[in-house]
């Protein structure tokens, strides 16, 4: 994967948005909705005892990622910075014998 792939993706996500077209509130609510669709997809597979539809799950996770990228942009945060921060946090947690997440 390219070093700045997440930054490039973040910029790509912004290309389809008109200036002033969406607000942080719209992005946050969209993230909640799409996260719910991810959960619903998993719930239905468990409830109906069938494999998760991976193509549908990829689609919904892509929608989640789109909203995360736009929330990051709306708040002035680069996705690569989020990744680095999270890797550092998890590395520290695991090295201290921390939790599972």
Task: List the model feature ranges, each with a label.
Residues 1-61, 65-101:
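Flexible "arm" and connector segments at domain edges
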């Amino acid at each position: 994967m390219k070093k700045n792939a997440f930054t490039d993706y973040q910029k790509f996500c912004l290309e389809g948005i008109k200036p002033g077209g969406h607000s942080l509130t719209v992005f946050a609510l969209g993230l909640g909705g799409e996260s719910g669709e991810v959960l619903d997809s998993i719930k239905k597979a468990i409830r109906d005892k069938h494999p998760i539809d991976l193509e549908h799950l990829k689609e919904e996770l892509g929608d989640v990622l789109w909203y995360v990228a736009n929330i990051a942009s709306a708040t002035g945060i680069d996705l690569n910075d989020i990744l680095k921060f999270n890797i550092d946090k998890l590395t520290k947690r695991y090295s201290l014998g921390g939790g599972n997440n």
